[in-house]
Amino acid sequence: MTAILITGYRSFEIGIFDHKDPRVSIIKQAIRKDLIGYLENGVDWFIFTGNLGFEQWALEVANELKEEYPLQIATIFLFETHGDKWNEKNQEVLSQFRAVDFVKYYFPNYEQPTQFSQYYQFLLEKTEGAYVFYDTENETNLKYFLKKAKDMPHYQLLLLTFDRLNDMS
């Protein structure tokens, strides 16, 4: 079994507030190309954390690819309460993350800050690599995950950056 974590910018972090934004189709083209590359190299699990934005678009692409490739999808939420306060439109996206092959809630609810690092450590230990939409020119809290990932020997990182997207458009 080979599992790849998929994570990246949330839609608000890159100023995309409408699913019909033309940038979404460019991002999804890049996702499709990269996910096919993973599948053709033996990856059989895509792991998500259930966030809006990049993960949402990658989940849509992964579900489309299930028609062509034997792949499994998992969502490992940080908390059971993840997305509880989202609006109705976003609740529909949350239901898509819950309708995958495997769903796990790492913690019942928030209790202390160390839960975040424990969660990311778990994700790193259960996956062989990560596909991350991230650019050091536009930092977010993902920088902490990426630092841990880069410190792990043999952990494979594929970054989708703004430069790569510009090359594709």
UniProtKB/Swiss-Prot annotation:
InterPro entries: YspA. Coiled coil: none annotated. This is UPF0398 protein Spy49_1277c. It comes from Streptococcus pyogenes serotype M49 (strain NZ131). Belongs to the UPF0398 family. PANTHER family: UPF0398 PROTEIN SPR0331, UPF0398 PROTEIN YPSA. HAMAP family: UPF0398.
